[in-house]
Amino acid sequence: MLPRENRLSAEFDFRRLRREGRRYGSPFFNFFLISGQKGPARFGFVVSARVSKRAVRRNRLKRIMRAEVENLLPGIRPGLWGAFWVREAAERANHPALRQSVRGILQEAKALL
């Protein structure tokens, strides 16, 4: 599980990321990033009911993505805030494709050390 200090949870933080963050796209999600914040890197995950009506499937997508971010956390620059807005195509993706997409978008955003 992603440590509490590395989670974004406040609605205000997500709104700020959407408004001020740099957007990176993938077939499975949009990723918004703000750099230059104080403290450790923090991440959030948004999977709306539009992606899947079933909470079990939405939670599964969040778990897969959280696990990959947690694996990459030691190599992520501190002071970054990022949020993943999951798209409908992610529900049909398999684990390796989704995990590779998370890794790829973080590399594209130069979030990895």
Task: State where each predicted segment sits.
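Positively charged, solvent-exposed patches that mediate nucleic-acid binding
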Residues: 1-113
